Amino acid sequence: MSLNMFWFLPTHGDGHYLGTEEGSRPVDHGYLQQIAQAADRLGYTGVLIPTGRSCEDAWLVAASMIPVTQRLKFLVALRPSVTSPTVAARQAATLDRLSNGRALFNLVTGSDPQELAGDGVFLDHSERYEASAEFTQVWRRLLLGETVDFNGKHIHVRGAKLLFPPIQQPYPPLYFGGSSDVAQELAAEQVDLYLTWGEPPELVKEKIEQVRAKAAAHGRKIRFGIRLHVIVRETNGEAWQAAERLISHLDDETIAKAQAAFARTDSVGQQRMAALHNGKRDNLEISPNLWAGVGLVRGGAGTALVGDGPTVAARINEYAALGIDSFVLSGYPHLEEAYRVGELLFPHLDVAIPEIPQPQPLNPQGEAVANDFIPRNVAQS
C-alpha cells in the first residue's frame, strides 16, 4: 500500500526548541512559502494548516500558497459552531476550484472552553458534536449539489444552495479526529478519513477497530490517518540526541502551566495524550521509538517517532499494517525537517507521490442572475 505523507505549516510559530524564544524564528509568508514549496518538491501529498486563536487564519494561508505550488494539497479546518455550513460550503468549493482540486478539509469541533467562549460558542462537549453532525450533513449535501432545507437542534437553513460546484467530485475529502464515543460515531457516519494522534500501536489499533465497526454499522468504509512528529537522523543516537535538545530549554514552570491549560479542555484525545507522560520528563519513550516529549508543552499531537530512516520507516509500516494510509508529520524547525524526512525517511517507504493535476475545464457561464441562478439554467427553470 502506497502511503500518503503530509507535512505541516507552522502558522503558530517555529524554532529549534520548545517552550522558549531561544532558537525561534519569525514565521512570515515568505517562510511558510519556503516550507510549502519544499513539501511540494519533495513529494508530500499535502500540508496540514492548523487552526485556533494561536494560529494565522488557515484559509487565507492556504489560498496564498496555491500559486506558488503545483501539486501540494491543503488540509484546512472546518469550524462548526463558528461558521455556518452554507458559508463553509461556498468557501470549500471556492478553495477547491481556485486550487484545481487540491483542497482537503479537516472537521474541528474545538475543545478549549475559554477559546470557544471567545469565539461566541457556549456549547458543551455533547452539544458541540450534535452541532458538528448537523453542520456536516448540510455541508456535504450542498457540495453534492442539493438545495437544502434543514431544521435541526442547532442549525436551521432554508433553500440553501451552492451555485459553483467543487472540482473534486462528489466533494473534497473530509478528515476528522476525535477519541470520544460521540466523535467516533460522527466519523463513522459522515467523514471520509478518521485521524488519530500518535498513540502506541496497540491503542491505535483499538480505536481503528472501534471506528471501523461503527462505520460498518452505517454501511460505510472509511480510511485512516495518524498525526505524528518525526525526529529522523542518520543514526539512532543522533536522533535521540536531537529529541533531548528539543526540550533542553524547558523548565518545570513552563511544563506545569502548559499541562494546566490542557487540563481545562474537554477533549478525550488531549486527556489520552497527557496520560502518556503525566507532565514528567522521565520515561518519555512510551513505545519503541515513540517519544512523548513534545506533549509536555504542545497541545494536540504530542508524540514523535525518533530514529534513523530505516527504524522510523519500520514503525510507520507497523501503523500502516493496522490500516493507516495517511501520515500527517511535522518536526522542528519545519523547513529543515521537511528536507530531512524527505531525504532520510522517504527512500525507505512506499510513498505515494502525487501527480501535478491537469487543469479541469469549467462550464462557461454568465453572471449569476438576481444572485439566485446562473444563465445557462434559465431555459430549464
Swiss-Prot record:
One Gene Ontology biological process: alkanesulfonate catabolic process
Gene3D superfamilies: Luciferase-like domain
Catalytic reaction(s) noted: an alkanesulfonate + FMNH2 + O2 = an aldehyde + FMN + sulfite + H2O + 2 H(+)
Database matches in SUPFAM superfamilies: Bacterial luciferase-like
InterPro entries reported for this sequence: Alkanesulphonate_mOase_FMN-dep, Luciferase-like_dom, Luciferase-like_sf, SsuD_RutA_monooxygenase
Pfam families: Bac_luciferase (PF00296)
Record GO terms (molecular function): alkanesulfonate monooxygenase activity
UniProt keyword Secreted, yes or no: no
Membrane-spanning segments: none
Keywords: Flavoprotein, FMN, Monooxygenase, Oxidoreductase
Record EC number: 1.14.14.5
The family this protein is said to belong to: Belongs to the SsuD family.
Miscellaneous remark of the record: FMNH(2) which is absolutely required for this enzymatic reaction, is provided by SsuE.
Subunit structure: Homotetramer.
Its job: Catalyzes the desulfonation of aliphatic sulfonates.
The protein's name: Alkanesulfonate monooxygenase
